[in-house]
Amino acid sequence: MEAVQKIKCINRAWFVLSFEVVGPNGHSLSSDDLPIQREGILDLTEGGFPEGTEVVLRVKAAMGKALAAAEKLRVARNGKTAVFEVRGTSLDFRVELVAIREAEE
């Protein structure tokens, strides 16, 4: 399980979406609406998640379904970013982890 500080979601789908990061105790951190071909980023440490917490990304299509990523992540103050891409249509889409980026200096 990768340890990251931030989660980036890139909308490569054909719909407006929003995304949230959810912890085991129900605590969550949500994005604003993310238009087509845009990206958003959430800093987990600024969102109130303690280090070591396991979280999962959940994507919701506007007027469509919601889908969780297959990968769980662990919160850490290490500057790393998990990058996810969303592709498909509002009723048939996938959420894919495409990279773990190192901290930028």
Model-inferred region functions:
Residues 1-105:
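Intrinsically disordered, low-complexity segments enriched in small/polar residues
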